[in-house]
């Protein structure tokens, strides 16, 4: 008689796992998303109290498992990679808000979140450059729906989320009808209680659909705490489209200072905007506007303003700036002093007098 083969329950379980592993995923957005969410839950969400070295290994396994299922054609691979990082971004934010997370796991996930953002932005730029197969459309429909989740203001990472939203609509969701539909949907949500993310999204889609006329009125609904979100449009749009944002900052810089009392955050804000304000004022030949902006932004604008005044030979104003700022002689560059001396030595007298008086008084 034929020998009977004994198979243990454990072997059966392993064989079942192998079969499940090898099942191909249906080539649809929803199947891919479900597979990712399931893998992320098993590897990451269920292990948020584990030591970070263990989480590092599980993160690598998670990424490898997803990549192993991807199609090999270049353009599809780019799309699938983008979708992988997009959902990883969403799922990581959800995990970071979990009550069951250790300090080490939080630190690890925050680092991964930054890397995920960089990868996503890189892939969006790559996807812009390839011709898009028609079959991408159902995937883009899924991305459009899931992007709406990023507009929830209670998400503590909403600055990063709104930038992902803006980048996706700029780089990969270029179909005019899609953009118009999105703008219509956003405008229905606009009211006095609308969240800042809805306002930012509406401004962005207005720019992309050439509806620039409502940008200015929407900007005025922003609170000073949200002004740093404006730098995205100044950095990434052309000079013409950036104009209303630069003007808004020029007009409202004092409001920002009333709100933001932290020295370094004020300095960072001014340092970002000042080169753009200068470029804009040069273009429209209104340097007095730039000077007024610099004066409002003192002391954070000091270095920029000082070099501008020397560059344009406004030596009297340069001396006044140093007198106002009470800066010691050691901190004034000898080249700067020579430049003023060659132009009009008398201008330096009040500066030297002030410094001598300080020495006598102290």
Where in this protein do the model-derived segments appear?
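Eukaryote-biased, non-catalytic alpha-solenoid scaffold regions
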Residues: 5-362
